[in-house]
Amino acid sequence: VRRTRSDLNEHELYKSDLDSQGIIFPDIEKPKKIFYELDAELDALYDKTMILLSHEKEGIKYLRYQAIKFLKEEKKAKYKNADVASQALAKLMKTLLVKRIDSSFHAFKESLNRFTIATEAMTKMFANGTVYIAPNLNVNEYVMEEREDELLTKMIALQPTDPTIEICSADDFIAGFAEGLQRDFEILTELNKAWQKIEQDPKLDEFIRRLDTELLQKEINPAQKLVVFSESKETTTHIVK
C-alpha cells in the first residue's frame, strides 16, 4: 500500500512511528507557473504545428511507423497484432513530438528532423522498388547513406534467425500507402524547413532569465540549489551548453 506524506502525517499510528524515529517531512509549496510569450510569427507556427501533429484529417498519419499494418495479408500474416502494434507506435510518435515541442524548441527540432529523415528513407525505398522491414537494424542509416547492397547482404544473413526481417516490393503494400507516405514526407519537409529557421526559444530564454535573477536567490532558495526535470534529455543537455 502506498502512502503519501499527508497520509503519514495525518494518521496517528504512522505519525507516532515517524516521530519516534525522528523522521520529519518538509512542507513543500505548490508548484508556481512561469509564463513565457511567443511573438506573432512563432505563435502562428506553433499553432500550425500542433494541428499538423494531431489533426486526424489534416495532420500527419505517421505512416513511416505503420508499414506492417499496410502489408498485404500474405506478408502481414507473420507479424502478430500488426494493426494494433502499428497504431500504438504511431500514437507513441505523435505523443513524443507533442511533448518535445513543449519541452524545448531545440528538442523538437532535433526530433522533427530525425522523423523527416526516417520518412524520406522509406519514400526512397519505394522509389527504388525495394522496402526493407528490419526492426532490429538501423535501416534509415543504410538507405540515407546509399548502402542498400550492404543492408541487403546483412538482412539475408540475419533472416534465418530474425523472423521480423522482411524484404518487400512496393506491390506488397495495399493501395494508398505509398501515396500517404509521400504526403507525410511533404508535410514534414515543409514543417522541418520552417522550424530549422527558428533560432529563438522564449521558454528557454525566460528560464535562464529567472535562473539569473530569481530562482537561486537566497530569499527563496537558501541552499541555492536547483534540480531541473525535463521531458527530453536533449533539452537539459542544451541548457547545460
Residue ranges and their predicted role:
Residues D83, Q87, K91-K94, V98, ...:
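Conserved phosphate/pyrophosphate-binding and hydrolysis machinery centered on Walker-type P-loop NTPases
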Residues D102, E186-T189, K193, D205-L216, ...:
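Amphipathic, well-packed alpha-helical segments that form the structural scaffold of globular domains
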